[in-house]
Amino acid sequence: MNANNLLQAAIFIVVLIAAAVPVARYLTRVMDGSSAVVRVFGPLERALYRLAGIDPLTEMSWKQYALATVAFNALGVLFLYALLRVQGWLPGNPQGFGPMTVDGALNTAVSFVTNTNWQDYTPEQTVSYLAQMLGLTVQNFLSAATGIVVVLALIRGFARHTAQTIGNFWVDVTRVTLYVLVPMAAIIAALLMSQGVIQNTKAYQDVPTLQTTSYAAPRLDAQGNPVKDAKGNPVTVQTSVKAQTLAMGPVASQEAIKMLGTNGGGFFNGNSSHPYENPTPFSNFLEIFAILIIPAALCLVFGNTIGDRRQGVAVLAAMTVALAAAIGIETSAEQGGTPVLASLNVDQAASPLQAGGNMEGKETRFGIAQTGLFVVATTAASCGAVDAMHDSLTPVGGLVPMLLMQLGEVIFGGVGSGLYGMLVFALLAVFVAGLMIGRTPEYVGKKIESYEMKMVSIVVLLTPLLVLVGTSIAVLADAGRAGIANPGPHGFSEILYAFSSAANNNGSAFGGLSVNTPFYNWMTAIAMWFGRFGTIVPVLAIAGSLAAKKRIAATSGTLPTHGPLFVVLLLGTVLLVGALTYMPALALGPGVEHLMLFVGAH
């Protein structure tokens, strides 16, 4: 960790927190209807309600809200699945791509609807422009809006008292999409285009290369997976290349909401390491900023809405401290290089002539500082976009993003999902504190009783169950082990990372695992769906229960939840639950792999 790395991280955090304040103010006014933007575009909003037959003045109970949420997203899965299956017969397909397989289309549909954007295919070789724009990009907006409205419903649960409703799902989704996501995405898309991100609907361009390139390429089967011989080694074929095909497409418009909505699915297989998605250091900084700005602002929206800004600041402070620590560990691990190369007297020190450290799988235009920022931001949030190959990170460098996902992505987290996950941990923290001092736990004026803790338990335990059971099945099943390209602890890490990513709706991956198979498509689809809606429904149940409670006044015995002590308690709860749940699995994967580096060095 050198001065350059520290300075870049510090500048980013300062810019993020400074920008979160006005964005939070705007979000608060949009959702309560007091914003001038809502008044100006009110006729359009009301026209949409009339067209859909919605009464915007009728609010919903938590059960109605949950039913609308699940039904809306289930219809999204069906529509996107159908679109991917028939894309070969639709216009907007200049490359003539055929339909996806049944399991591949279902996996992709579930992936984008759940805000995961897990991609086990090569987008520029699989998905047509129409499917990208009408299917994937639309779901990038709607899945992000779903996460935001769920946390807004939970915030209303804290803010209201003796109420039977928590808002109207259709009104919330419309306002978030129309007034927040669309204008912010348009601004980010314009900035990305100014940096060189492409936006067109041209057919792919064939250009001659400067010289003929010959190489041994792996032979692929019909599903795009490497073919292996009887000994398990990849079968290769000699290939010569005299021309290069440059993929085109409407990239900037999808890239903007991909980052802003913490979606993460790339237009290209290289994701944000591809120069057409992320060409410059400024575009990289902008994309990292876009990932975290709404999650950061929502913390302050929480404080604004419940009438105590200190509560939102405390949650934001806990997230920021954890983010800064993760950036420090990640960047230090990558900047430090590997003991194996050090034993061979390879110079890994940063200098004016080299970035130093572990540059494998990284883009030289970003270096270790911006790559470390991106790795942490994309896994602290439920984004999953990458500007470097996570499979090439050092063992400790790979452990950091894996653990951030396994903690529930509550360090900022996805748009909406991060804050409602952290508020669930806040309820758990005050419950534990209440047990220690023998008092009924309270949080922001609401008593936390057995019903809320049952729902909290479901949220906290469900995703670890999906991750660990899914990993166990994949390790034991022949179909699961067949996808491992790197046997040993790293192969185990790849499977653990895959299910951590799917169940926590992240979408990033260690690239050494071949997952475009029926086994992994079905397994990860199940993990993604229940990881998303298996937590959303209990969160809405908590919102409904809290809204019905009376607000109680703070007394001398009430635990203050706005100071440094609570920040420490909250972080301790998050880390303790994560450590107890995942430490054995992490020891078998990244832990063993890290120790093997020192064995190899000697």
UniProtKB/Swiss-Prot annotation:
Domain of life: Bacteria
Keyword tags: Cell inner membrane, Cell membrane, Ion transport, Membrane, Potassium, Potassium transport, Transmembrane, Transmembrane helix, Transport
Tagged with keyword Membrane: yes
Statement: the UniProt record of this protein carries the keyword Ion transport: yes
Single GO MF descriptor: potassium ion binding
GO cellular component: plasma membrane
Membrane topology: Multi-pass membrane protein
InterPro entries: KdpA
Localization (cell): Cell inner membrane
Pfam families with a match to the protein in the record: KdpA
Broad class of where this protein is predominantly found: membrane
TM region(s), chain numbering: 3-23, 64-84, 135-155, 178-198, 282-302, 313-333, 418-438, 456-476, 522-542, 565-585
Function: Part of the high-affinity ATP-driven potassium transport (or Kdp) system, which catalyzes the hydrolysis of ATP coupled with the electrogenic transport of potassium into the cytoplasm. This subunit binds the periplasmic potassium ions and delivers the ions to the membrane domain of KdpB through an intramembrane tunnel.
Family assignment from sequence similarity: Belongs to the KdpA family.
Subunit structure: The system is composed of three essential subunits: KdpA, KdpB and KdpC.
PANTHER family for the chain: POTASSIUM-TRANSPORTING ATPASE A CHAIN, POTASSIUM-TRANSPORTING ATPASE POTASSIUM-BINDING SUBUNIT
Annotated protein name in UniProt: Potassium-transporting ATPase potassium-binding subunit
Organism taxonomic ancestry: Bacteria, Pseudomonadati, Pseudomonadota, Betaproteobacteria, Burkholderiales
Name of the gene this protein is made from: kdpA
